[in-house]
């Protein structure tokens, strides 16, 4: 839970739970207060002139006199919770990661079922993804048709990546496995440079395609898509896939209209092998939404952060309220 002006309020992940032993002192304060109230009443009844007492003392003492002590006890509980060091999940931008954008440029990407055509829409959404991705992440670009080409090695230069995306042109065949292997090689190369003492940076492949692989025909062949996915799994690289298009896509080839329906099965299997996530998009807007989701997933990591400030501020406010209530109601500090 996150409160305005205060930040996250968490009751989990305490770093110093032994501070809760201080709550025993709070219980002691409450107990002493109760005992004091009973003792005070007995003293009054023992030594006071009852006729005078009945005339000057209110028949029922105001319950508001207990408010300062209640607030004091509450503030001590809040401050103790702050001292125990609660934590909450915090999303922080990644500053050393590699993302490879692998885009299918086979001739089926010229289908106009997604206006103006699949490839043009992919270009626009891909450039938006490049702009939105956390600036410190190294982004690379691979295109694949019959073969795969590393157009832009992983870099933080977004202009270079967008220029590479603009250069994409349709070509025959679909060699999905080649695209994945090329991306893995680029990841390995930049990892050897960036690794250092911290080891290779975390990496992710984002694979966008509209159809099943046809080079080779068997995805389990040495250069096939499933073989490449298993290689990615072995390297600890997740592959997120985007199947892009509709079941009604067509392209014109030598005077004939050829159906090119989108195929989800191959890409879903690649995700299963690598423990990645599969997406489907059938319009430019939905493709942009998918890329935005990926950007939020890839560009940040979740870590445990300190969440004691909210408890500290609440405790301070309640403590100030206890002091003020004591002065206004009882004409003394709460005790």
UniProtKB/Swiss-Prot annotation:
Membrane spanning residue stretches: 18-38, 67-87, 309-329
Stretches of the chain forming a coiled coil according to its record: none
One Pfam family this sequence matches: BatA
Superkingdom, natural source: Bacteria
HAMAP family: UPF0353 (MF_01340)
Annotated ranges, domain VWFA: 98-294
Record family assignment: Belongs to the UPF0353 family.
Membrane topology label: Multi-pass membrane protein
Alphabetized NCBIfam families for the sequence: PRK13685.1
UniProt-recorded name of the protein: UPF0353 protein MAP_3435c
Keyword entries, A-Z: Cell membrane, Membrane, Transmembrane, Transmembrane helix
InterPro entries hit by this protein: Aerotolerance_reg_N, UPF0353, UPF0353/GerABKA_families, VWF_A, vWFA_dom_sf
Organism field: Mycolicibacterium paratuberculosis (strain ATCC BAA-968 / K-10) (Mycobacterium paratuberculosis)
Compartment list: Cell membrane
Gene Ontology cellular-component terms listed: plasma membrane
